[in-house]
């Protein structure tokens, strides 16, 4: 590389949607510093691994990726490990992987340029602070997006302290971004071509703020204000906690046309005994009541969930109760995982840790039921007309892929249309993970 060539960077994000958002913000920040993006880490001058610590497998994958960055001549790029693994393991990362130059937690990544500068001077630059001031004010303003959809972090951190979860320790206490900042960022995204925004938070429905008139509002109020923005066609939010599904938010699902009929509401288990051990602070009955009320407000809503199988002490009867809540809820989709023992969490030292073989067998049974429900939900859409936002090209000539209001991928052959267009379609076929459709008419 010539000395006057701009330095290149590659950001690889693991895990949740908020990590995707954080990765995009880091990329924007590096772009403002004169770096240009590289397609992958093989030839980049700087590689940022934006990590996830929710499960052991995701955390260990980071070290595998670090090892693969070593080049044939023995050199490595400047390597920065960001995100929740960085926060949880800190200097241990640099000890295990000496090629790592920068370790930065999720609340300090706005300092990434100065940490890189320190690394280039030969220092091991580590910043795990959780500063009181908001990192968001230090980030560059949002620019053109190139895609019709975008994430917008409105809330970070969690105060729930579920006994299996590292998020309160890696992301910190719950904070809500100011209303005015969120409206400004949303407007910048829409000006850059975004038509759908997903509001993000570890506990997104705990967001609170004050509107332009100084009135206290919750997430439902923010959604109603965003819905007034011309050019913004769709609004989603994730991830929610059952205890923070307020009356106002439930009502908004029935009243705000731009709020998509989709709700991701994790329950994790169907046994009150296990929910108590998890410190979920809700019961099976209260969860099902929320689902009932949401469906009363928006009958066509798609419900998504999260499940953990094999939590310490889970009996066969407890697991059977999880299958029961799945049958009662009728999920459109759901994510299910084996319990992952995370150091530092209360569940890691609980008695009656479940054997791996038992967890595997239970996970297979749960996923079979969830897959059956997902297929049934998809098949129920066949013959319906709906509106798609076209997001990317398909594999076939003239084929585009969009998202339905219920978050399914929909394949449609629509010559003359482009990514970012909206189109009315009729659903013609349903698979386990996607739908097929025929176009009816384009919408400007």
From Swiss-Prot:
It comes from Sphingopyxis alaskensis (strain DSM 13593 / LMG 18877 / RB2256). It catalyses: N(6)-dimethylallyladenosine(37) in tRNA + (sulfur carrier)-SH + AH2 + 2 S-adenosyl-L-methionine = 2-methylsulfanyl-N(6)-dimethylallyladenosine(37) in tRNA + (sulfur carrier)-H + 5'-deoxyadenosine + L-methionine + A + S-adenosyl-L-homocysteine + 2 H(+). Residues 144-376 form the Radical SAM core domain. It is found in: Cytoplasm. The lineage of its organism: Bacteria, Pseudomonadati, Pseudomonadota, Alphaproteobacteria, Sphingomonadales. [4Fe-4S] cluster 1 binds at residues 16, 52, 84. This is tRNA-2-methylthio-N(6)-dimethylallyladenosine synthase. Residues 7-121 form the MTTase N-terminal domain. Belongs to the methylthiotransferase family. MiaB subfamily. InterPro entries: Elp3/MiaA/NifB-like_rSAM, Methylthiotransferase, Methylthiotransferase_CS, Methylthiotransferase_N, Methylthiotransferase_N_sf, MiaB_methiolase, rSAM, rSAM_horseshoe.
